[in-house]
């Protein structure tokens, strides 16, 4: 699943590049939009009594991102477990990879305790499974 984003001036560091921490927001937006496209927006998940939280992130920065860049965040699920998923994502500009991320998300109940994800949510995550990223 691909999400297109545009770099905003407020995301730049003093050197004119996107600050490294902003990449995490880009990857998060990619995951959020991928889930929403499958009918699992974050508010809908909350209303059903569970939350999706990030428990681990590894980012590799491959090239600079600058003002006015149009970026694609490509998101795929690499592994689905009953209470977690491992995502692989790429930040691209014109087909060139600028950063990669591997993110583990976990499901919790309203109180923050680990929980098994509903079967329809797990099925949706499996539809995002790909080795392409």
Positions of PLM-derived features:
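HotDog/MaoC-like acyl-thioester-processing domains
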Residues: 1-3, 36, 61-67, 77-133
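Hot-dog-fold acyl-thioester-processing enzymes
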Residues: 1-54, 110-133
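Small beta-barrel nucleic-acid-binding modules, principally OB-folds
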Residues: 49-66
């Amino acid at each position: 699943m691909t999400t297109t984003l545009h770099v905003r001036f407020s995301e730049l560091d003093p050197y004119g590049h996107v600050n490294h921490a902003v990449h995490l927001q880009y990857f998060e937006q990619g995951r959020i939009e991928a889930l929403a496209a499958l009918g699992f927006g974050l508010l809908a998940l909350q209303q059903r009594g569970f939350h999706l939280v990030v428990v681990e992130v590894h980012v590799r920065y491959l090239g600079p991102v600058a003002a006015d860049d149009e970026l694609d965040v490509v998101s795929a699920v690499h592994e689905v477990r009953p209470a977690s998923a491992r995502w692989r994502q790429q930040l691209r500009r014109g087909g060139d990879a600028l950063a990669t991320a591997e993110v583990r998300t976990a499901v919790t109940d309203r109180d923050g305790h680990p929980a098994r994800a509903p079967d329809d949510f797990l099925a949706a995550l499996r539809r995002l499974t790909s080795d392409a990223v």
